[in-house]
Design a protein with these regions (language model features):
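N-terminal, Lys/Arg-enriched amphipathic/low-complexity engagement segments
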Residues: 1-7
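A broad "ordered helical/assembly scaffold" signature
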Residues: 9-11, 47, 150-156
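A substrate-binding/cap region within the structured catalytic cores of diverse enzymes
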Residues: 69-119, 123
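Activation targets extended, charge/polar-rich intrinsically disordered C-terminal tails
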Residues: 100-249
Length: 249
C-alpha cells in the first residue's frame, strides 16, 4: 500500500496500550518514511526505554512497529496519506536528525499535557514535528515552545481524556509514567487530561490539509480488514459492507 501510494512518508498510528475504557483506540503514532536509513518505511518515533528510563528517537522497522500491541485486543493501524507538498515537507522534517532531537523532551509522561514542555509523550513529539514541517518556524532555539504556540494558533485540539474517577488522577502522583503537575489546575479539578493522541493528530491533519486519504486496518482471528475513509472500523474488527477482508497468512 505504501509503495503504491507514490508518497515518501505517511503518518501511522497503532493500537498498543488498551485504552478502551477511555474510548480510545490508538495510543501511538510516528512517521513511516520510505527513505529512512534504517530500512525503507521504518517508523521514526519517540520511544521510552524502560531500562534507560528516558525517551529517545527510535527508527523501528514497520513490521516491528505493527506487532507491538496488547494481545488482549485486536491489532489496529491507521495510515494518513497526504498530498505531495505536505508530504515532502513532513518527510524532510522527520528525517532531520538534529531537529528530531531538538524537539525531544527530556522527561516522558504518557499523559503529558499537550501545551507544556515539562513532559512529552510520543504523539506530542509527532504534533510538534508537524508544526516545524508546516509552520516555517525558525530553528535556532526554544523549539518546543515555538511548536506548541504554532499548534495552538492553528487550532490543534488535544484529546480530552475523562478521568471519571478520582483515583485515576490520584494514581498520577504514584505511577512513574503518569504525571499531573504539568496539567492546569482547572483540568485536574474537572478530572480531564488534555493529551496529544493519534486521534487528535488525525483530526488536525484532516482539518488543515485537503485531499488526505485515510486507510485503517485491523487483524483478528487470522484475517485482515481494510477500511478506507474517516469513519472507523467497528469495534471488534468487524468488516463493513465496503471493506476488504484478506487472510492474514
Amino acid at each position: 500500500m505504501l509503495e503504491k501510494s507514490g508518497s515518501d512518508a505517511a503518518i501511522i498510528s497503532r493500537s498498543g496500550t488498551d485504552l478502551t475504557r477511555f474510548h480510545i483506540r490508538y495510543s501511538h503514532s510516528g512517521f513511516t518514511l520510505k527513505k529512512n536509513e534504517n530500512t525503507p518505511w521504518s517508523v521514526r518515533q519517540l520511544y521510552y526505554g524502560c531500562e534507560d528510563q528516558k525517551p529517545s528517537i527510535f527508527d523501528q522497522g514497520l513490521s516491528g512497529f505493527l506487532m507491538t500491541h496488547d494481545d488482549n485486543i485486536p491489532s489496529y493501524v491507521s495510515v494518513l496519506l497526504l498530498p505531495k507538498p505536505e508530504t515532502d515537507a513532513m518527510a524532510k522534517t522527520a528525517l532531520d536528525n538534529k531537529l528530531s532531537v531538538e524537539l525531544l523532551g527530556n522527561d516522558y509522561s504518557a499523559n503529558a499535557y499537550a501545551f507544556s514542555t515539562i513532559y512529552q509523550n510520543c504523539n506530542q513529539w509527532v504534533a510538534e514535528m508537524l508544526a516545524f514541517a508546516w509552520g516555517n518556524l525558525s530553528s535556532n532555539d526554544d523549539f518546543r515552545n515555538k511548536a506548541q504556540a504554532w499548534l495552538k494558533a492553528n487550532a490543534y485540539k488535544p484529546t480530552d481524556i475523562d478521568a471519571k474517577y478520582s483515583y485515576v488522577v490520584w494514581v498520577g502522583h504514584m505511577i512513574p509514567l503518569l504525571h499531573t503537575k504539568d496539567h492546569p489546575s482547572e483540568n485536574i479539578d474537572r478530572k480531564i487530561f488534555q493529551v496529544s493522541m493519534p486521534a487528535a493528530i488525525e483530526e488536525f491533519v484532516k482539518n488543515r490539509v485537503d485531499n488526505v486519504s485515510r486507510v485503517e486496518m485491523c487483524l483478528k482471528d487470522n484475517r485482515i480488514v481494510i477500511h478506507r475513509g474517516w469513519d472507523s472500523i467497528a469495534d471488534g474488527c468487524i468488516a463493513g459492507p465496503e471493506d476488504d477482508v484478506l487472510p492474514a497468512s
